[in-house]
């Protein structure tokens, strides 16, 4: 009645584990040109441009950016901060993102498009919904980076720069 052995035992020798593919990322040397193209883009919603710049400055995951809510931000203080709730984080722990003055400036600009409540980066046509998962990727592709860069790849770019600087411990960088 009960199975004595494991019928799948030994299958790991037959099937190989798929290799994980890293996200395409721009070399840091190309980032200034990319940002210039973002700034010069035409026919793109201003909120999309601001979201791209904010994502580059904070190097958060796309989902964290898309679902960012105004109540998570404290920007009117000496040390502006974004506190991302654990339920939205990959590791399930609350995450604190210090904000540069440039990031704060982007948030201040975004208020004219999204208002002071709800999603910081909402859909243009339906502000009660977050920005589409593909908005920033399509924007990057439109700038001529299709296949060369993924939005998640910016995290790789920043991680490489920070690790090569040797100013921070690799474990601390990985936590960001």
Identify the function of each model-found stretch.
Residues 1-3, 168:
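Bacterial peptidoglycan biogenesis and beta-lactam-recognition machinery
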Residues 3-68, 78, 90-93, 113-115, ...:
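Basic, Lys/Arg- and aromatic-enriched nucleic-acid-binding interface segment
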Residues 15, 56-58, 88, 103, ...:
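Short, flexible loop/turn elements at secondary-structure junctions
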Residues 24-25, 97, 129:
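Helix-turn-helix-type domain boundary/helix-start signal
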Residues 33-37, 74-126, 139:
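Basic, alpha-helical nucleic-acid-contacting "clamp/cap" segments
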Residues 36-48, 58, 97, 111-125, ...:
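Short, basic (Lys/Arg/His-rich) helix/loop patches that form interaction surfaces
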Residues 61-63, 91-92, 106, 128-129, ...:
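Flexible loop/turn segments at secondary-structure boundaries
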Residues 71:
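Alpha-helical DNA-recognition elements
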């Amino acid at each position: 009645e009960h199975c004595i052995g494991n019928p799948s035992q030994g299958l790991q020798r037959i099937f190989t584990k798929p290799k994980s593919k890293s996200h395409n990322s721009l070399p840091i040397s190309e980032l200034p040109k990319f940002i210039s193209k973002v700034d010069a883009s035409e026919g793109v919603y201003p909120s999309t441009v601001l979201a791209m710049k904010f994502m580059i400055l904070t190097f958060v995951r796309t989902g964290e950016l898309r679902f960012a809510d105004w109540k998570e931000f404290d920007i009117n203080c000496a040390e502006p901060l974004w506190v991302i709730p654990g339920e939205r984080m990959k590791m399930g722990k609350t995450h604190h993102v210090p904000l540069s003055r440039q990031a704060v400036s982007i948030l201040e600009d975004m208020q004219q498009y999204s208002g002071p409540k709800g999603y910081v980066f909402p859909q243009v046509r339906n502000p009660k919904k977050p920005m589409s998962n593909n908005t920033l990727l399509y924007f990057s592709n439109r700038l001529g980076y299709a296949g060369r860069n993924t939005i998640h790849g910016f995290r790789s770019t920043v991680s490489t720069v920070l690790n090569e600087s040797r100013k921070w411990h690799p474990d601390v960088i990985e936590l960001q």
